[in-house]
Amino acid sequence: MKFKLNLITLALLANTGFAIAADGYGLANANTEKVKMSAWSCKGCVVETGTSGTVGVGVGYNSEEDIRSANAFGTSNEVAGKLDADVTFRGEKGYRASVEAYQLGMDGGRLEVNAGKQGQYNVNVNYRQIATYNSNSALTPYSGVGSDNLTLPDNWVTAGSSSQMPLLMDSLNSLELSLKRERTGLGFDYQGESLWSTHVSYMREEKTGLKKASGGFFNQSMMLAEPVDYTTDSIEAGIKLKGDNWFTALNYNGSIFKNEYNQLNFDSAFNPTFGAQTSGSIALDPDNQSHTVSLMGQYNDSTNVLSARLLTGQMSQDQALVTSGYGYQVPTEALDAKVDLIGLNLKVVSKVTNSLRLSGSYDYNDRDNNTQIEEWTQVSINNVNGKVAYNTPYDNTSQRFKVAADYRITRGMKLDGGYDFRRDERNYQDRETTDENTVWARFRVNSFETWDMWVKGSYGQRDGSEYQASEWTSSETNSLLRKYNLANRDRTQVEARVTHSPIESLTIDFGARYALDDYTDTVIGLTESKDTSYDANISYMITDDLLANAFYNYQIIESEQAGSSNYSTPTWTGFIEDKVDVVGAGISYNNLLENKLRMGLDYTYSDSNSNTQVRQGITGDYGDYFAKVHNINLYAQYQATEKMALRFDYKIENYKDNDAANDIAVNGIWNVVGFGDNSHDYTAQMIMLSMSYKI
């Protein structure tokens, strides 16, 4: 009897009982040497070809008084248009292409195009735009904003204080503090034989705009609009080899950053003081580059997974130094900075039994600053400078070691825990070595049909080598001061989460977290910090067409700090309280008007508040900082035809903040020329009409 092995036969063999497989009759033992697999075909399989998806266009009207609202609405233009698309083309023999666009034409728009042959190669082209708006009400007396040379009016009259400058208020012009980024990328992936594959991608980011800066002469300062015109070119390439239970990959990452401007020149608005200077310069972000090469691999059998990665790289910058206004000889025209990087990651996961899994990892990262040390003469202003100084080549080495166990006690009940160790070694710091030891455990129960809950606790300690005042700052800091990132610390943390679905259409989720950082040996500095947060979420499918959801998040961080006004024991105590409340709700109704209309409403409210009190004999309040924002989005979508849908969105944002750093008049501080009041208090609205068409 002749027996032909076909797809149906294979399916039957694959579902044969374990008893047959155990006796050597499993599918793995089938003799397939004479089977002509190249002649196999699936006559019942139909591969759909052609184009499918949706495309859409939209136009919106933006009524805004404060440009900050563009962060929420995605555009700063009064009238804005957008293009959306999700289109896929499938051809014969595995050829495929896709186009995805989201709000293209607006500040947060993005586009991604892919084309290739499935399982062989793919070409990717992508574009994304990101914008961040700060203020359009900043004021400055300078001309040349956006360039590297800021000048005052020709008839400017200097004075000893900003309030005495006769032409200041009449010379003010408004400017926009915002940053825009455009990213364009190109990538190629190729799958060779079954053993190897390769990829290469390139991305260019162009960042433009204005950001805050300041220039000073002795104790006088002017707020300046720093021009931003950055270009960053990034490239990534790699090759991957793989087998049945292993793979290895070699990758390269490179980044080259260029700044169109290397310095910002500006006039002084004040009477000449130290050095009788009437103009100055500040250095801007220097050109730099970074290159890394990494080798990684993984081995996986039925019991163990071993993975490793080795990385080496270098960061460098050789920008010419800005020497304008510096009256001494410089030891070198450019710093020629170099930082070498080495990284190593090892990890193993072992399945000891069906119920027990063990894991361990080791991470090593070394940052070696090989910049040449030079001797520099400081400009003399007070008793802590005017001396010879040296650039400090900071090095850092970090090691992390983790072990963990994951044990399934019974079905729906699991216990896991572990131990984490971290060591950081630094030079030219108040403390050369810090060690952190942390133990943690978590217990999870999801054996109940409608409940899923877990609780986790951890305790950690940080200590290290002897704390010594740095020779670079010893004359300027209290010997009792302990920097919070280097000081001894005990950390206790507890968190839990409960998810309950009493009925199929209702889900309730609640989580809480508490963390206490106790800086036990600190006399001057941060002595204690508490972080408490909790959140609640509810989602309810009221009917098949009506869905409602709501959430609430709360966090409060309380910190205590001790200080001294006489370089000795504590004379004052500071208390800082930061709170954040976020609440939101949404409702959507589908299948109205004969299953053609969907309507919805989303609302969120956020309130962040910060308050600082200082006690030194009497209690002084620095005043609250707060930011409050309401966001509403009302929308409706109507299915006009089988393929065409119309959508209407109405968005509102009400925002108000109180920040002492922004709430200052241009001449509000005698020795500062500021940007004026840049606090926010506005209500903005946006209407968007859009249409989508199904191809």
UniProtKB/Swiss-Prot annotation:
Its main location: membrane. InterPro entries: Decahaem-assoc_OM_MtrB/PioB, TonB_rcpt_b-brl_sf. Residues 1-21 form the signal peptide. It comes from the Bacteria. One of its GO terms (cellular component) is cell outer membrane. It is found in: Cell outer membrane. Pfam families: MtrB_PioB. NCBIfam families: OMP_MtrB_PioB (TIGR03509). This is Outer membrane protein MtrB. It comes from Shewanella baltica (strain OS185).
